[in-house]
């Protein structure tokens, strides 16, 4: 990245960092069970709820407890269950049409980040009928208060239940972009471990590593605060203490609860302090090839951390202490290596292989451009990179994919 652009990026990030205390950040109110939602809905005098979820959630029957509670309270509801991974503008349009057709005045995002992001986007479109989603992309373009928005995460990872962002993919161009504004923060986050008990081990692993990525990128960036550093450290501690238990013993309700809270803390951390190039590259892969976001983050996180080099050693040392991998006497570079290696070992334990077979070399300039456009100047990363420099990560993934395929063929 040239010097002038670096100066612009750092000035932009510094201005946002200075503004943090004056911006209307808020944390959602936490409730521990979907059974508490009818009382909340009635308290807000809402009359018809749109539940936005996906087909997999419906097949697993995860909404049944919520539906039963709503029926017993006499609250009408409508379900939109066509949300896909990396939700598209088509999903938002279909759900919005249902919202208006049924006369809804409250929204529940029930599922992973895709369902919650779709719910946020529907809420934004409901109050901004004369603007397209594309016109709302970027920062602070929604302005208006959304209908009552509640989030029920069924994975412990995305943190969307805490954040001001909705990430949507244009169905035509496959460009993935974020809408960022304070009204998109859900009013209530339901951290109900019972809805996560049936989560398969591999999804438990990749979404848990998504939460870890949120915490790490928020912590190592240049726009942290006392609060965000504290939230990130709590998230890392909880993840390292609980992710293996949740992976191996999915019915362990305490581990599931702790992972939900870790995801919540990580979401709070990156809402104020942002993420970094792991997310920017992962979003480009999700938009172009529909690569699951948590999987992309898990593969990319150690690659990007190593590329940052020694400039993040001190911060990784503190994260290593939180993870129980080092103490204050451990040299910074050793602690940093321990932390990165522990992430690589975590991937190996969970069977996460370095394969993104969809990548085409001819797509790399476009993908790197998308990542650059998302990250710069907004993300306060430790080391700035432009599109040409970001291309290396896609080539790394191609090389790793080739090695993994060769290894499999030799077995």
How would you describe each model-predicted region?
Residues 1-73, 77-79, 400, 404, ...:
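An N-terminal, well-structured beta->alpha segment
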Residues 90-194:
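Glycine/threonine-rich beta-strand-loop-alpha-helix active-site module
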